[in-house]
């Protein structure tokens, strides 16, 4: 299927050419190439960047790795960016390295090493020999996350990898690995135990056989995190990894158990080495003799904040006493680490820094990576610019309103909650200033009040809920207060919903389900505790390990999914993080427990989303997510009898643990599913799943919404912001019968004429400005041809692409019809 924009009253035509058999059961999803999703951003608030590598001979060529948004490249110092990893099996990037002797050679270690509660997964090491245009997978699939890749400076076949291993379990595929044949084979050269991985790795710039490794024992459970243990330590090799020596208290390390260790080495004086060590009393250590002995440089309480999430240090390539610490801000010390001051504030270019690249030939040039994206300094950090054209937003949820054009609402990791248009009726695309922030913190569900276009609700971590008037900016906190003597437990990403029948009615889940009938002014509790209430899973005040970190991210035994039926008032489905599933059919007066009716799901499995059917009030879809116990299988179920029996919809085609299922409101067997590894769809109620690859990269797809009026599929991703597939109606009527016809014209929607204004002045930012894709011009006509033996050659595809590009560049008319 090909869709091409045609000016004015001509039509935008979709075409797909079918295989001669025309069999619906053997339908090839690549034939839907014309129904390409469009990336709408936003990019003004980007997403977490975990690694940066640039070409030393030309630092304008820079690569960045995103926590769950793949690899990107700029050839002009960050003015524009190109994604390079969209068609690879995973999107989580932990490490990048450029072979400077031939900078077309780029290595990637997948799986983020900043092990927060929402981190994604990797599957080993990749290498490109052509600057990122193509990639080869080099193995180490089970390492799960890689925080550092070190390349031999002159031998392109030699590399070392710091593999952290599983976050939510134990496995032997962790430690330091080495290849001497370009990744064909690997040797594990440093290993401690199944609980300890390599969190950092540095190489002596004058002696490639000398490396230091920071080993880290760590583990997450759904309700707890522990950093540190006997496995953690600092190791050194003098022979490229064949033998290692562990440094001890006798060498100057802190006594007792250690945690994460961040490492830095001076390029100008390699005998000067730094180690930021998590311990009962964390410390920055410095060695002036190449790591033989270590002295304390800084023991201040704030020397190592939140090491599980930060903990990296860098040394100025010219000034061996200038040390950078990456944490909430970028801090710098000019006295060998004894005293730090804030250099780049998180309030300037966003906070929570994870990556840094310093130009070794001109250390004034620095690239920073943080939870908001990329910052660039050209004066050694005295000033910094923030890059606003990387659409790496990590959305948790999306919602839509009924405005014209409609708006999309959503919350992002560490980037608040926002509202923005799905398209704009002017030239120039959807730009950052079109988006309005309506909530802060880690944004989660952000819901419009469909009875009042000026009102919306924004949820952030810990069940904090606010109501905002988007016209006036008036804000009100409406989180329910606990009754006397009761402690409410709210998940980091609590369940919330509005009622489809009663305007102004809101539901919010703690361990109880709370209901407000007056937009949050007052609340009533309408359920008993719907969780297991297991006290062993309620020790969040003790979480963190060596460094306490009771942020609320490990809050457990809580409600995380609240789903009112759109068909029958009083029907509510509720899911919890400890695997409890309930339904009420009388508005909360009575509740039925359902989880024991679901076959094949491990006990206590997370229930992130429930989708009540839009065709039958007794039907619902539930996704279960057990990756927090190192089980990455998808679990997707359907009931048609109020939860008494359940059918699995998982087939061998699916990849990635499941996040959200969306059922089409018109064709009940048309299903869309978001998993950790992309967007999937089924035309037969889940009998066969196909990956949607047209415009949607490999990325965690967290939420899906079908717009009830415009028939668009809105896709909220955790790593690549928001995508929209315009007008999915052809998928509703597609069948063996229609595909067997020589020619079939599919239903087209109403068309609304509107003024397509010129690009507004006063906002232009040059080449660096991000412009989200708007909906296509004209009505959309979609037809299929069934011509036996008719090929769809690559040159035909290329001609279609060229035609679309030419027409997109044409001068647009003053008035254009629009799909309503």
Language model feature labels by segment:
Residues 7-8, 13, 53, 132, ...:
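Intrinsically disordered, low-complexity segments enriched in polar/charged small residues
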Residues 758-819:
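Contiguous beta-strand segments within globular domains
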Residues 1-11, 346:
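Bacterial N-terminal signal peptides that target proteins for export
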Residues 10-22:
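Bacterial N-terminal signal peptides
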Residues 4, 34, 44, 123, ...:
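General helical secondary-structure elements
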Residues 24-769, 776-779, 786-788:
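Beta-propeller blade termini and top-face loops
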């Amino acid at each position: 299927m090909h869709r091409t924009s045609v000016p004015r009253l001509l039509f935008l035509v979709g075409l797909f050419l079918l295989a001669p058999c025309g069999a619906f059961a053997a339908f090839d999803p690549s034939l839907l190439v014309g129904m390409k999703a469009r990336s709408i951003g936003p990019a003004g608030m980007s997403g977490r960047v975990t690694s940066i590598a640039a070409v030393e001979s030309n630092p304008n060529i820079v690569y960045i790795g995103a926590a769950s948004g793949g690899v990107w490249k700029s050839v002009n110092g960050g003015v524009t960016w190109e994604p390079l990893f969209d068609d690879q099996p995973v999107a989580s990037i932990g490490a990048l390295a450029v072979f400077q002797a031939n900078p077309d050679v780029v290595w990637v270690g997948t799986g983020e090493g900043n092990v927060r509660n929402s981190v994604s997964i990797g599957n080993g090491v990749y290498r490109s020999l052509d600057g990122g245009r193509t990639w080869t997978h080099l193995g180490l699939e089970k390492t799960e996350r890689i925080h550092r890749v070190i390349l031999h400076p002159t031998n392109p076949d030699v590399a070392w990898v710091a593999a952290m291993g599983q976050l939510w379990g134990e496995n032997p595929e962790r430690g330091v690995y080495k290849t001497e044949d370009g990744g064909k084979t690997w040797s594990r050269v440093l290993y401690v135990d199944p609980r300890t991985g390599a969190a950092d790795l540095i190489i002596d710039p004058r002696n490639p056989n000398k490396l230091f490794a920071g080993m880290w024992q760590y583990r997450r459970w759904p309700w707890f995190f522990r950093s540190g243990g006997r496995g953690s330590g600092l190791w050194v090799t003098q022979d490229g990894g064949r033998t290692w020596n562990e440094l001890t208290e006798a060498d100057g390390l802190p006594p007792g158990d250690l945690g994460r260790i961040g490492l830095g080495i001076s390029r100008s004086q390699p005998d000067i080495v730094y180690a930021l060590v998590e311990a009962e009393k964390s410390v920055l250590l410095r060695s002036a003799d190449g790591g033989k002995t270590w002295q304390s440089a800084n023991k201040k309480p704030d020397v190592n904040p939140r090491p599980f999430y930060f903990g990296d240090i860098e040394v100025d390539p010219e000034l061996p006493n200038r040390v950078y610490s990456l944490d909430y801000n970028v801090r710098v010390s000019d006295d060998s680490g004894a005293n730090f001051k804030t250099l780049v504030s998180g309030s300037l270019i966003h906070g929570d820094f994870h990556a840094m690249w310093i130009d070794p030939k001109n250390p004034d040039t620095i690239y920073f990576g943080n939870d908001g994206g990329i910052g660039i300094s050209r004066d050694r950090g005295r000033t910094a610019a923030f890059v606003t054209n990387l659409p790496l937003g990590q959305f948790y949820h999306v919602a839509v309103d009924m405005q014209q054009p409609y708006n999309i609402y959503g919350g992002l990791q560490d980037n608040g909650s926002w509202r923005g248009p799905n398209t704009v009726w002017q030239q120039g695309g959807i730009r950052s200033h079109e988006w309005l922030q309506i909530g802060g913190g880690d944004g989660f569900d952000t819901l419009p009040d469909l009875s009042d276009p000026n009102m919306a609700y924004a949820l952030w971590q810990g069940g904090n809920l606010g109501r905002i008037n988007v016209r006036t900016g008036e804000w009100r906190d409406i989180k329910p207060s606990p009754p006397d003597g009761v402690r409410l437990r709210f998940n980091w990403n609590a369940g919330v919903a509005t009622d489809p029948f009663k305007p102004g009615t809101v539901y919010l889940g703690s361990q109880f389900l709370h209901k407000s009938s007056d937009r949050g002014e007052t609340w009533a509790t309408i359920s008993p505790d719907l969780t297991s209430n297991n006290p062993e899973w309620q020790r969040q005040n003790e979480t963190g390990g060596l460094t306490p970190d009771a942020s609320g991210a490990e809050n457990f035994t809580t409600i995380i999914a609240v789903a009112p039926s759109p068909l029958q008032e009083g029907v509510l489905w509720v899911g919890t993080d400890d695997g409890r599933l309930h339904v009420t059919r009388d508005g909360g007066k009575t509740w039925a427990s359902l989880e024991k009716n679901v076959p094949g799901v491990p006990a206590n499995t997370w229930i992130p989303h429930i989708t009540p059917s839009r065709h039958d009030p007794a039907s619902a879809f539930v996704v279960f997510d057990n990756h927090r116990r190192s089980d990455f299988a998808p679990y997707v179920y359907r009931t048609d009898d109020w939860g008494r029996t359940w059918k699995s919809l998982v087939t061998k085609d699916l990849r990635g643990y499941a996040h959200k299922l969306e059922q089409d409101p018109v064709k009940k067997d048309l299903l869309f599913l978001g998993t950790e590894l992309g967007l999937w769809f089924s035309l037969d109620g889940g009998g066969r799943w196909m990956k949607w690859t047209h415009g949607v990269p490999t990325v965690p797809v967290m939420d899906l919404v079908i717009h009830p009026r415009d028939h668009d599929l809105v896709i909220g991703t955790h790593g690549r912001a928001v995508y929209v597939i315009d007008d999915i109606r052809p998928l509703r009527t597609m069948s063996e019968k229609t595909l067997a016809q020589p020619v079939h014209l599919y239903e087209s929607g109403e068309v609304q004429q509107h003024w397509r204004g010129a690009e507004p002045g006063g906002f232009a930012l040059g080449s660096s400005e991000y412009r989200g894709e708007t909906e296509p011009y004209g009505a959309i006509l979609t037809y299929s041809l069934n011509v036996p033996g008719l090929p769809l050659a690559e040159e035909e595809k290329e001609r279609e692409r060229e035609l679309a590009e030419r027409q997109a560049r044409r001068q647009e008319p003053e008035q254009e019809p629009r799909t309503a």
